């Protein structure tokens, strides 16, 4: 299902005054959006598309074959334009922007989309975006972050692709409350759904335990965001072998609570170039085949997902 359907639903209900009038009644967002009580709704979401050609090659057949539900592309990266053209030619697919403020690889780097002079705090001594989130947090103002994420959205629109949603690469936009504020502000200004999680006490505890600085101020910003949210969020687990990776993924699926859960992964086809970019290449190659694996498809169907 395209995120655009969710935003149309949300826009249609926002003028109503009460939760009952809005139809937003239920214990989780799956129920609020009309799924039967107790439903486990999973969004399989491909991240880091546009980062390299190998990522594009992996994501496109997944989407065309309806084996995954959505993907998000990195505007500053060299292969974004190619994927944007593909998205324009395949409007039925849910393609968003993976708003990117870091450039994490050792030798494969990129800089900002906006004028570097306007975002000096986002740029490391080598002239690229910072390797790690902490570099952004320690140097970039919220104003600089807002300039850059809006430049990325504008770049996509100028190429002819209006994204179906936006989310955040490496969680950077959740690393400071003022970053989260400009993220949601951009989402509302452009009328593009942002990936957001319903911050129940259990979810807050989970993400704080993972090292995310979820402050009360950030929770307030999330609560004020009026479009539909996720109930939980996961990454496809790593494994020492493909079989182990699949087995751990099955355990994750069986552990899900009712509601809408997004599970992200980073598919790429195997090449020597990919191996030179990232030492996580093997996990990415496995993730490029696991969701077309008949055993995985059968398992998901058996779980009612």
Tell what function each PLM region has:
Residues 194-195, 277-305:
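C-terminal domain-boundary segment and adjacent tail
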């Amino acid at each position: 299902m395209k995120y655009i359907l969710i935003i149309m639903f949300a826009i249609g209900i926002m003028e109503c005054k009460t939760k009952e009038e809005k139809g937003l009644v239920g214990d989780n967002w799956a129920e609020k959006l009309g799924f039967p009580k107790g439903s486990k709704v999973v969004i399989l979401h491909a991240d880091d598309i546009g980062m390299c050609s190998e990522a594009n090659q992996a994501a496109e057949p997944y989407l065309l074959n309806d084996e995954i539900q959505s993907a998000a592309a990195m505007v500053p990266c060299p292969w974004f334009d190619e994927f944007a053209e593909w998205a324009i030619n395949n409007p039925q697919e849910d393609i968003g922007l993976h708003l990117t403020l870091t450039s994490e690889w050792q030798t494969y780097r990129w800089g900002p989309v906006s004028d570097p002079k306007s975002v000096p705090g986002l740029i490391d001594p080598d002239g690229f975006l910072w390797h790690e989130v902490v570099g952004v947090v320690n140097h970039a103002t919220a104003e600089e972050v807002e300039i850059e994420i809006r430049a990325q959205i504008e770049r996509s629109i100028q190429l002819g692709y209006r994204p179906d949603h936006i989310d955040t690469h490496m969680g950077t936009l959740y690393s400071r409350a003022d970053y989260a504020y400009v993220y949601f502000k951009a989402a509302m200004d452009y009328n593009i759904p942002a990936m957001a999680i319903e911050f129940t006490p259990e979810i807050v505890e989970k993400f704080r335990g993972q090292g995310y600085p979820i402050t009360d101020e950030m929770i307030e910003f999330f609560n004020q965001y009026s479009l539909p949210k996720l109930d939980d969020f996961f990454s496809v687990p790593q494994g020492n072998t493909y079989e182990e990776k699949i087995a751990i993924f099955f355990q994750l699926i069986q552990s899900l609570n009712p509601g809408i859960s997004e599970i992200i992964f980073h598919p790429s086809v195997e090449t020597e170039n990919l191996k030179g970019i990232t030492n996580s290449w093997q996990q990415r190659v496995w993730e490029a085949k696991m969701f077309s694996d008949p055993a995985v498809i059968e398992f998901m169907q058996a779980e009612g997902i």
